């Protein structure tokens, strides 16, 4: 709650516009995470602590597990892969050039949810802020992030099997109206 008392003559009798920068909610973050410095110390034991953070991974964790405004009545903490979110959160907190000679976190998330929407739509929006996709692996909701990684398997021309007709690839597709 904010209250202001100002003299109208200071603004020439015009209506004053006031804007506020709010930090948002206190959410659960890893116990070895310093949200002010955006650093992780030591090995994480899986425990969480309350703190403010605009790291998209921990905002997503909050939205998925909070019972009042999130999906916490349907999903418990055991149903969400916090270890995948931990790796994603570390990637989001890496410092990158800001274009002005300084650095900034790779990804931040400052959302204000003002209307009720379908859970999947909100989940997709949160995930798109950090270039990841939600995946149900049969036991938990986990996440796969699009980020640079080591080569898993190199494919070269020698890996392509050519049939007797000299064709290496056969392309097939469905009609556009059937998709």
Where do the protein language model's features map onto the residues?
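Polar, S/T/G-rich
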Residues: 1-130, 137
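Surface-exposed, non-catalytic interaction/assembly patches
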Residues: 3-12, 110, 144-179
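Hydrophobic or amphipathic alpha-helical targeting/insertion segments
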Residues: 128-144, 149-154
């Amino acid at each position: 709650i904010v209250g202001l008392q100002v003299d109208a003559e200071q603004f020439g009798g015009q209506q004053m516009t006031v804007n506020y920068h709010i930090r948002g909610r206190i959410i659960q973050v890893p116990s070895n995470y310093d949200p002010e410095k955006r650093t992780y110390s030591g090995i994480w034991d899986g425990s969480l602590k309350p703190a403010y953070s605009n790291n998209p991974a921990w905002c997503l964790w909050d939205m998925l597990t909070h019972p009042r405004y999130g999906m916490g009545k349907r999903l418990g903490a055991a149903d969400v892969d916090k270890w995948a979110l931990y790796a994603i959160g570390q990637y989001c907190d890496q410092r990158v050039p800001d274009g002005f000679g300084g650095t900034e976190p790779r990804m931040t998330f400052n959302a204000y949810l003002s209307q009720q929407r379908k859970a999947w739509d909100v989940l997709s929006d949160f995930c798109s802020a950090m270039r990841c996709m939600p995946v149900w692996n049969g036991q938990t909701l986990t996440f796969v992030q699009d980020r640079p990684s080591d080569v898993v398997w190199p494919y070269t021309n020698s890996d392509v099997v050519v049939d007797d007709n000299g064709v290496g690839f056969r392309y097939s597709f469905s009609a556009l109206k059937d998709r």
